[in-house]
A protein has these predicted regions:
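Short acidic, hydrophobic short linear motifs in intrinsically disordered regions
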Residues: 476-487
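Nucleic-acid-binding small beta-barrel platforms of the OB/S1 family
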Residues: 471-474, 496, 509
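Short, cationic-aromatic polyanion-contact patches
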Residues: 459-463, 510-530
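Short amphipathic alpha-helical interaction segments
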Residues: 490-501
């Protein structure tokens, strides 16, 4: 996919998924307007600012599929998995339109950028959609999405309280007493955001994963004041350094992906050394929480599937649920071999951010919460099928955890094996189905279809039919409905009377599966011993 950021905006506009607002709008109103809108919003005239703002681009599942050129949400997962397995390294170019205006030194002024506030208790304007690129001299290059709170015209905070590769890079730089250069590319295509949002192993370039998503290399261009690249298609680029202050400065609060207000964090400071942009740059503000949800969810799917593949588990479907903030909860259906319910849980729970996992058989629809709850209700014994792993690395944004400064939190991970237990006959889980469902259709009867009456037998005919039924079930056990079908020339009452006749004569019994058979025959079920 060669589409750039602006072409994506045009496509949203053409399909009615983006609305242009040309009237003056106060920047303080942007977040709530985006929250109320079903479409993305393009604010052409932000009061007091030169540049326009666009927000809410990926606020729905449908727009996330549009962004990655997919017809279904599952296709996004497949596409991302393909990109992870077959990354395409970035292509380096000399310059880009983001160099049309370059501001350095005292010219740097973040207050000239239309950076909105979001939630009512936010600690300040937040840059939310920047693709951040950093390099460690030993560990290689890393990309990710991090927020920056504006503190001064050329100073921000960065939220890297959560354990991740960027935090590791910053920690190593801090311990060496040096700043960590970073580039921040704002206004990139969602492909670059999705690629950089994947938590790749150290040494794997997330921009190469973004290239795999595109099917062609992501173009990167060199910064001016630091030895790092930026995304060439970006609207605005910040060249910066994470200062070696340690995690000592207050940062936040912020309305998080959890749909809750996050607490006050302690984080490093960031010095902005240069701002470059297109002459007519568009400022993209990623709206919380839903844009974060739909952009991040595919990376969770891919990570879970990769972990299960490594464990040798055959996966049918995965649902990273919205109720779990598309982050903490997963329901996974598998084609189970003995013992694999527990193996699947262990593999899935190894994915860092997952907190609660339910594994079900492949007859369960993981996207139907009633089906999943039914599987838990009918297939789980708590003492055998619920697994709790304590003291696992946890996400600091989990509000149920005790919060402590400077401590990477640990918490419990819970797995529920809601697959059919080993040793339980499969027929215990035969679902209710209805006789004649293949031919008796309600629409036909509403349209006037009628059924013909069968033979209504007298006592002699009932006795004769009983003998015929006895001959049939003497050869093989038959379900009651099969008998009614085999002797459909008679009306149902006559068939029922014939079976009653056999019961009175003490000739009728049932096999262990409930089928009708001859009493005392090899098929007959035996009463349990008292």
């Amino acid at each position: 996919m060669q589409e750039n950021f602006r072409q994506f905006l045009d496509r949203l506009r053409q399909t009615g998924e983006l609305v242009d607002l040309h009237q003056p709008v106060d920047i303080r109103h942007i977040a709530t307007l985006v929250d109320q809108a079903d479409t993305a919003l393009y604010f052409h005239n932000v009061v007091g600012y030169e540049l326009p703002v666009v927000s809410g681009l990926i606020r729905t599942r449908e727009r996330s599929m549009m962004a990655l050129g997919c017809e279904t949400y599952r296709e996004i997962e497949d596409k991302l998995t393909q990109a992870i397995n077959h990354p395409i390294p970035p292509k380096y170019v000399k310059t880009s339109p983001a160099r049309e205006v370059v501001l350095v030194g005292d010219e740097v002024d973040l207050y000239k950028l239309p950076i909105p506030m979001s939630s009512i208790f936010d600690g300040g304007p937040m840059i939310t959609a920047g693709v951040v690129i950093a390099r460690d001299p030993e560990l290689g290059i890393n990309s990710g999405i991090y927020r920056f709170i504006v503190k001064e015209k050329s100073l921000t905070g960065i939220d890297i309280v959560t354990p991740n590769n960027m935090r590791l890079f910053a920690q190593r730089a801090y311990e060496s007493g040096r700043a960590l250069p970073i580039s921040i590319s704002i206004g990139t295509h969602p492909i670059e955001i999705t690629g950089s949002g994947y938590r790749a192993p150290l040494g794997v370039d997330e921009m190469a994963i973004a290239g795999g998503l595109r099917g062609s290399p992501v173009e990167l261009a060199p910064c001016t004041t630091i030895d790092l690249p930026y995304v060439a298609d970006a609207e605005i680029v910040l060249e910066a350094e994470i200062l070696p202050t340690g995690w000592t400065w207050p940062e936040g609060r912020f309305g998080e992906f959890t749909r809750l207000m996050g607490g006050l964090h302690w984080n490093p400071l960031v010095r902005i050394k240069a701002i470059s942009r297109r002459k007519d740059a568009i400022y993209y503000n990623l709206h919380m929480p839903w844009e974060n949800t739909w952009l991040a969810a595919p990376t969770r799917y891919a990570a879970i599937r990769q972990a299960l593949r490594t464990a040798g588990v055959q996966v049918k479907d995965i649902n990273v649920t919205l109720g779990g903030c598309a982050f903490w909860h997963a329901v996974i259906s598998i084609k189970k071999q003995p013992g694999e319910g527990k193996n699947a849980l262990l593999a899935a729970l190894s994915v860092m951010d997952l907190k609660h996992v339910v594994v079900v058989d492949d007859d369960i629809d993981v996207f139907d919460p009633t089906e999943v709850e039914w599987a838990i209700a009918t297939r789980v014994q708590g003492d055998k099928d619920v697994m709790v792993v304590g003291n696992a690395r946890a996400k600091p944004l989990d509000p149920s955890l005790p919060q402590g400064y400077g401590v990477v939190p640990t918490g419990a991970k819970v797995g529920i094996d809601a697959t059919i237990p080993e040793g339980i006959p499969r027929e215990y889980y035969e679902r209710i189905t209805y006789a004649y469902a293949d031919r008796a259709k309600i629409a036909d009867y509403i349209d006037g279809k009628s059924d013909e009456a069968g033979i209504a037998g007298d006592d002699i005919e009932v006795a004769s039919l009983a003998n015929k039924i006895l001959g049939a079930i003497g050869k093989e056990p038959l379900y009651y409905t099969d008998i009614a079908e085999r002797f459909a020339a008679y009306d149902f009452r006559t068939v029922a009377r014939a079976l009653g006749h056999l019961h009175v004569a003490e000739k009728l019994w049932q096999d262990p599966r409930g089928r009708m058979c001859v009493r005392g025959s090899e098929f007959a079920a035996k009463p349990p011993r008292r």
